[in-house]
């Protein structure tokens, strides 16, 4: 039902509402709901988020837990957007920064040799095609983290560059970004002719952060 649904890319709306209105009720609501979601869906062994409770007991073909690439990309993109607006003195900022760094560190280790991330973070062999919506969100988050001094540049820049070059290679001559998994809830196979606006949006967000870095 609706009251039990929480979306990882929605919390930045509340930080923006706070900026627009100055009313701290939006920040307080976001903090409460985010921590409830974190407690429910974050796997502290794998340092990754489940898409929702239905995946707690499911396993991939290789026996590993099901962690959706784009789902965790949404979380990282959302965290970057929260941190852009959350007041520096907010008592909960440390929680978001530490979670951001922890998640970036984890996904960095799951990058494929070709620079992409896959639809399934722990079973890429079952979904061998690149998946650009998770890749573009992760690239955006890494670039933001480096720019803001949250991530060590020497460690994360090579991963970022590799990811950026990979996603650029998925852009066709007509400008279409391929390998974007369609709307869904879990890992699925992807082809180059698949595209969606959220993949393109995250691509552009990452590009903006990389432009800042290059100036």
Regions found by a protein language model. Name each.
Residues 17-25, 59-66:
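Active-site cleft segment of glycoside hydrolase catalytic domains centered on the general acid/base Glu
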Residues 117, 124, 129-215:
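CBM-like carbohydrate-recognition segments
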Residues 1, 24-50, 97-115, 158-176:
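Long, well-ordered core segments of solenoidal/helical folds
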Residues 2-7:
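Short, small-residue-biased leader/transition segments that mark boundaries at the very start
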């Amino acid at each position: 039902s609706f009251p039990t649904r929480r979306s990882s890319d929605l919390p930045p709306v509340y930080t923006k509402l706070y900026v627009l209105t100055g009313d701290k009720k939006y920040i307080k609501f976001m903090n409460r709901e985010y921590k409830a979601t974190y407690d429910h869906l974050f796997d502290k062994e794998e340092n990754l988020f489940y898409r929702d409770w239905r995946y707690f007991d499911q396993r991939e073909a290789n026996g590993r837990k099901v962690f959706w690439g784009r789902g965790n990309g949404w979380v990282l993109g959302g965290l970057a957007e929260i941190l852009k607006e959350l007041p520096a003195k907010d008592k909960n900022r440390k929680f978001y920064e530490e979670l951001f760094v922890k998640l970036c560190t984890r996904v960095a280790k799951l990058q494929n040799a070709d620079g992409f991330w896959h639809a399934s973070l722990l079973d890429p062999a079952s979904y061998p095609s690149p998946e650009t919506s998770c890749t573009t969100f992760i690239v955006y988050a890494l670039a933001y983290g480096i720019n803001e001094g949250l991530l060590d540049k020497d460690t994360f820049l090579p991963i970022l560059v590799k990811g950026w070059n990979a996603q650029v290679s998925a852009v066709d001559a007509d400008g279409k970004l391929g390998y974007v998994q369609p709307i869904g809830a879990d890992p699925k196979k992807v082809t180059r002719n698949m595209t969606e606006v959220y993949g393109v949006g995250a691509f552009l967000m990452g590009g903006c952060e990389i432009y800042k870095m290059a100036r």
